[in-house]
Structure formats: C-alpha cells, structure tokens
Amino acid sequence: FWILDPSVSPMAAFNNPDNRRVTPKMYLTAMSQQTNDILPEPMVLMPYLAGRERSVDMVVENGEVIAAVCRRKEGALQSIEQSGVAFELAKTCAQIMQADGLVNVQTRDDANGKPYLLEINMRPSGGVCYSRSCGINLSGIFALRKLGLIDKETAIKMGTDGFKPAVVRSVSSVIALTEQQSAE
C-alpha cells in the first residue's frame, strides 16, 4: 500500500520507493494525466491507521464463537490475549457474517487506539498455530468438534480454561541441525 503524506518531499517516491510515501499533490497530478481511455485500476482508499494490528483466530459455529484468541502484533513479537475492544469487534463480525469454521478477523487501531475492521477470512490464518502457546489449541478444538468427539460446552470450556497470556516471535528461517543434535 501507499501512504499519501503531505509532509514528504515530492521526490520521496523516487528517492525511497520502498517507503511507499507520496504527496497527495503528486498522486492527483498523476491521476489528472490519465486519459479517459485509460482509467487507473480500481483502488481502495482508506485512512492511514497508525496503531497496532490484531489478528483474531476463532472457532465459530453458525455465527456463534466457541473459542477465540487474539494476537496483538508489535514488530517481530505477537502478544496473545483474550479480551479488548478489537477482540470483541472480531467476535461480533464473525457473528454478523454467520461464520462457520476456523476463521480469522484482522483489525488495526487508529492513532487513538480505536480498532477498525480490515478483513474477515473464512479460513484459518497462518498464525493460528500460535494459539497453543497460550494454552488454547484452536485447531484441536475445531477438529474435536468436527469429529463429534466433544460437545459445544466442553469446547467452550477448552477455549477459556488454561488461558495464559503469552508472547511469541515468528521464526521463518530454517535451522539446520547436525546429526548429533537431531538424534538428541
């Protein structure tokens, strides 16, 4: 995404294109030079949300949230929680959408800390596995429910009992082990 920032130099997009900041005037100038025959591709414009991003993973059955865990993203770290305005917003979204399955809702706070809905994914997120680090195994709860091995009340209890706040760091590199290390 690009940030329309009136405080950056008109050359910002050229001097540091990876920063993805451009003046609104520069953007409007480029748009005005488009001919009627060649319209720009459709775009989504939204306010810049400077606050924290949250990812809420949930086990949902026909809009009823059975279990949920929220990951608050802070750089390379993610703090896992089970409360807050963004957490409640995500649960309400799943209910309104009548979500069903292992789903994910993304929010981001504005500069004042108010969360805004970014998207709801009717599928598991890539980070759903991190829920285990806080004592709640969302994938396990989902599987047990789908297999009919636990009732809804047990699943709800599994989604809250044993919760402990945790902080995780995503590691995406491969660490090669020696034969001796892998045998241990």
Where are these regions (language model features)?
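Amphipathic alpha-helical segments that line or abut small-molecule/effector binding pockets
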Residues: E88-T92, I136, G140-L147
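Detector for glycine-centered tight turns/loop "hinges" at secondary-structure junctions
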Residues: G63-E64, N112-G113, G148
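A long amphipathic alpha-helix within ATP-dependent nucleotide-binding catalytic cores
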Residues: Q34-P42, R72-N112, L117, N121-R123
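Short solvent-exposed loop/turn micro-motifs enriched in small/polar/acidic residues
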Residues: L49-R52, D100-L102
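Active-site nucleotide/adenylate-binding loops and adjacent lid/helix of ATP-dependent enzymes
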Residues: F1-M43, A50, N62-E64, R72
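Beta-strand scaffold of nucleotide-dependent catalytic cores
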Residues: W2-L4, M43-P47, E53-R71, L89, ...
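Peripheral (often C-terminal) accessory segments that flank ATP-dependent C-N-forming ligase machineries
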Residues: I141-E184
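ATP-dependent carboxylate-activation loops
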Residues: S79-E81, S125-I141
